[in-house]
UniProtKB/Swiss-Prot annotation:
<keyword id="KW-0934">Plastid</keyword>
<dbReference type="Pfam" id="PF00557">
    <property type="entry name" value="Peptidase_M24"/>
</dbReference>
<dbReference type="GO" id="GO:0005829">
    <property type="term" value="C:cytosol"/>
</dbReference>
<feature type="binding site">
    <location>
        <position position="506"/>
    </location>
    <ligand>
        <name>Mn(2+) 1</name>
    </ligand>
</feature>
<comment type="similarity">
    <text>Belongs to the peptidase M24B family.</text>
</comment>
<keyword id="KW-0482">Metalloprotease</keyword>
<dbReference type="InterPro" id="IPR050422">
    <property type="entry name" value="X-Pro_aminopeptidase_P"/>
</dbReference>
<keyword id="KW-0150">Chloroplast</keyword>
<dbReference type="GO" id="GO:0009507">
    <property type="term" value="C:chloroplast"/>
</dbReference>
<dbReference type="GO" id="GO:0070006">
    <property type="term" value="F:metalloaminopeptidase activity"/>
</dbReference>
<dbReference type="InterPro" id="IPR036005">
    <property type="entry name" value="Creatinase/aminopeptidase-like"/>
</dbReference>
<dbReference type="InterPro" id="IPR032416">
    <property type="entry name" value="Peptidase_M24_C"/>
</dbReference>
<feature type="binding site">
    <location>
        <position position="580"/>
    </location>
    <ligand>
        <name>a peptide</name>
    </ligand>
</feature>
<keyword id="KW-0645">Protease</keyword>
<dbReference type="InterPro" id="IPR033740">
    <property type="entry name" value="Pept_M24B"/>
</dbReference>
<dbReference type="Pfam" id="PF01321">
    <property type="entry name" value="Creatinase_N"/>
</dbReference>
<dbReference type="GO" id="GO:0046872">
    <property type="term" value="F:metal ion binding"/>
</dbReference>
Amino acid sequence: MIPLTLSSPSLNRLVLSTSRYSHSLFLSNFNSLSLIHRKLPYKPLFGARCHASSSSSSSSSFTAKSSKEIRKAQTKVVVDEKLSSIRRLFSEPGVGIDAYIIPSQDAHQSEFIAECYARRAYISGFTGSAGTAVVTKDKAALWTDGRYFLQAEKQLNSSWILMRAGNPGVPTASEWIADVLAPGGRVGIDPFLFSADAAEELKEVIAKKNHELVYLYNVNLVDEIWKDSRPKPPSRQIRIHDLKYAGLDVASKLLSLRNQIMDAGTSAIVISMLDEIAWVLNLRGSDVPHSPVMYAYLIVEVDQAQLFVDNSKVTVEVKDHLKNAGIELRPYDSILQGIDSLAARGAQLLMDPSTLNVAIISTYKSACERYSRNFESEAKVKTKFTDSSSGYTANPSGIYMQSPISWAKAIKNDAELKGMKNSHLRDAAALAHFWAWLEEEVHKNANLTEVDVADRLLEFRSMQDGFMDTSFDTISGSGANGAIIHYKPEPESCSRVDPQKLFLLDSGAQYVDGTTDITRTVHFSEPSAREKECFTRVLQGHIALDQAVFPEGTPGFVLDGFARSSLWKIGLDYRHGTGHGVGAALNVHEGPQSISFRYGNMTPLQNGMIVSNEPGYYEDHAFGIRIENLLHVRDAETPNRFGGATYLGFEKLTFFPIQTKMVDVSLLSDTEVDWLNSYHAEVWEKVSPLLEGSTTQQWLWNNTRPLAKP
């Protein structure tokens, strides 16, 4: 799957930001709340406006245009009843705002969200996974990144202005709001849907024009107009993630977390990222499409822990599992009471402002101010702990730092790596059956649509042991649709698979023991010289990154150019990152690591991390090319160790043929030809035993034959 232009949940920060780097890591002092910011290797908290000009041959405009302007054939102005309805609420008692911001995220800053929380999609009609909508009394604008420009052009009606975030001349959402509102405007947000960092930066930018940020705790305006048609919240049962896949029991994970809490000089941590909660507790859910997580919050203290979750999802088995780990259950909606209770007992709270919503942090701030008078105001001693009946003895305070779970989860243990390797091989077998079927059908001139193809792939995957779900919506794009980077085919509007055009398929699966993500681009007939050249240069970038060796401590952005260099040589590029982290039977997009041109992410790649390798090239309204494998970061064997440094490299997890018909061999070096032939030999060796007794094995043999050197 395409890496986010910034690491998830980044687009809020991208469109609200005013500088390339995170400059507002500190919120205002909490008066009596002692606030410290601890620096760790960290992903960028806010995206920047991209000032570099594009070198792509893309025909997309760099400036903001309304959807009406893009579709000139549309002459009738659309009366958007949803916009009219939400604007009427601006003047309601307790609201009183001039603009309202609707982000993509839920209260946990999730990339994928339950249908009932898809508020931005509901209000705008744009269904891409990343974007921010802003509605004023007379304007409506939507920001999204380069993966979704073409999709947004198609889906937005003429009432909306499309803002191509990151392109030169395009303001961020906060800048635009500050400019279009009359001085003294009031900008409303749902504080549960914004990270504390994003809210603080927004507040700073609009304050320059004397605007006020208003937290609407008690009402979400989109929910008010959605009403009875809004889907119900998910209520599926939670399951235990088996220790043979997790590799580490809950007690061990909590012990490590508590040690880190105390090392930071704190006594508790509040966790809202759903994959972090699932990982720590060895639990999995199905509340969110494509991600095996459940809606919950987790508070871990030195001597106790509370899970805030809908109790109807908790089976007897899961209750026993949590009880054995010393975890008490609390209602999901009582999280703010839980935060208040921490302050009342004088907790020293570790908070990650890039992931915690501003409702939680503001509640803790207010509670600390309220309860601090109950403590010795002159006490400057370190935190001391008492038993749970007595509570804490220190003034309540907080420290901002990256969640330690993010790092622990990113570095896979042996059991997690084993599960990832095994699940990838089963996935490869399913893919082989699928591609063999698809090629045969296309050659028989079957009338297949992009949706037909995606549905059939799901059928093949569902036959594999341990299959749970897809890991994201399958990107099945024929011809020009392949250039829509996060294209999602719909039954009523998708294209037929055209054998005379390139076909791009980006797909993945969730298995009980691992998560997969793979992209292949093929031609069912004869590709043009242009298509072969572009494909080959993408392949060269893929090989260059796969073969990279680098010193320990190297951040991902240093490697990004490896994947682009071959394209750069002929003046081409692509508008997305090259690699994202991947969870082990968890989110297909995982931080803090990434491989991207955005050099604000200083997170070093470390042994045990998993990243994708997916360079691409796209010509709008023509074709798209992408080649993606998943890689495991591991120690590299080098003849020297300069300065005593450890060097790292990559081990492939994905084993599936790359179509050699698309390769212009004359462009490849001998080393690159050897890489491709060696890779295909490994594919045959590892996957063919899973295809014994099937005609698909012959298909795999045909597609893994060595490529002759020129």
